[in-house]
Design a protein with these regions (language model features):
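Catalytic histidine-centered segment of alpha/beta-hydrolase-like enzymes
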Residues: 281-292
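Conserved alpha/beta-hydrolase
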Residues: 113-132
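Hydrolase active-site cap/lid region
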Residues: 42, 177-228
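An N-terminal hydrophobic leader/cap segment in hydrolases
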Residues: 14-17, 21-71, 81
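The serine-hydrolase catalytic nucleophile loop
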Residues: 99-112, 125
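Alpha/beta-hydrolase active-site loop
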Residues: 136-157
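Short alpha-helix in the alpha/beta-hydrolase fold that links the catalytic acid
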Residues: 109, 244, 258-267
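Short beta-strand/loop motif that positions the catalytic acidic residue
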Residues: 241-243, 248-250, 254
């Protein structure tokens, strides 16, 4: 084989390898945001079974329930469920669940609010539960959805005299993100939420010894595939001029979303804020590990708000 043919063959091989690497690189860019934003969701049955294994859910079957749907700003239908307090009440709380969970995941907080005299509204965040499959925007569209649910709640229940929000993990971030819209609510309880999803991803990748630049690739892929930037998913920015009282709770042993996220948000809000950690609790475990302390913090917070308003 002549030298010229050898060079042509070598160039062809190099181009093929470069082409394969380019295809793999593009595939990685498009796959990363899918991995980050479309995790495997639980069914209602799976979530309820998990709740029943870890908490007493016998109360659920005794409650009067009403199922309905509420449309988000873009017309996306959210499945909602009202759990009526056995004692007639005009107080309501909307509870938002965490990532890959669904409204059954909110049941762990329902007994606390029933005891406090609230009717409880639980719902499936977009892309979860009975809703149509879609990707998660870590508070961006979810916050808009929650604001629509807040407005619907006030319209649907005209006897309402008090309305609060409670969220866990993604639900907490969603709850904080909704404050951007200045909703007419009386209080917020945000449990183990993130201030911005980028810091959570970078911390998780670092702990897994995965190169941090993959977060940047995921951000690029998210912009291309979903038209949302991971770096813009920052619930903390909704707190700059917030005046609604917020209670931030976090498990001290949470390694998925570090307690500093809640601490930073408590420092950022313009309104009244409390920040407490639950010793020995990992991610989304606070009410399981120490229900008495959890209840104490929530009740004292709500009592403090009522005292301030008196």
């Amino acid at each position: 084989m002549s030298e010229r043919k050898k060079k042509k063959k070598m160039l062809r091989i190099i181009l093929i390898i470069a082409g394969v690497l380019l295809v793999l690189f593009i595939a990685l860019i498009l796959w990363l945001p899918s991995f980050v934003m479309t995790g495997t969701r639980q069914t209602l049955e799976e979530a309820f079974a998990w709740q029943s294994d870890h908490y007493d859910t016998a109360f659920y079957d005794t409650l009067e329930k009403t199922d309905y749907t509420v449309n988000g700003e873009d017309g996306y239908a959210l499945h909602v469920e009202l759990l009526e307090n056995p004692t007639p009440s005009t107080k309501y709380v909307i509870i938002s669940h965490g990532y890959t969970d669904n409204r059954m995941g909110a049941l762990k907080y329902v007994p606390l609010y029933l005891d406090l005299g609230f009717n409880c509204i639980i719902y499936d965040l977009r892309g979860h539960g009975e809703n149509e499959p879609t990707f998660t925007t870590y508070g961006v569209r979810e916050g808009e959805d929650l604001n629509c649910l807040i407005e619907d709640t006030r319209s649907r229940y005209p006897d309402l005299t008090e309305l609060g929000l409670h969220g866990e993990s993604l639900g907490a971030a969603t709850t904080v993100a909704a404050l951007k819209y200045k909703p007419q609510v009386d209080f917020v309880v945000a449990d183990c939420g993130f201030s911005d999803i980028e810091n959570v991803l970078r911390e998780g990748y670092r702990n897994a010894h995965v190169p941090g630049f993959l977060v940047d690739l995921a951000d690029l892929g998210s912009r291309i595939r979903y038209h949302y930037a991971i770096k813009d998913m920052r619930p903390i920015d909704s707190l700059d001029d917030n005046e609604i009282p917020v209670l931030f709770l976090h498990g001290e042993e949470d390694t998925l979303i570090l307690p500093k996220n809640s601490e930073d948000m408590a420092a950022r809000t313009e309104g009244e804020a409390e920040y407490h950690t639950i010793p020995g609790a990992g991610h989304a475990e606070s009410v399981l590990i120490d229900p008495e302390l959890y209840e104490k913090y929530v009740k004292e917070f709500l009592n403090g708000i009522e005292t301030d308003e008196a």
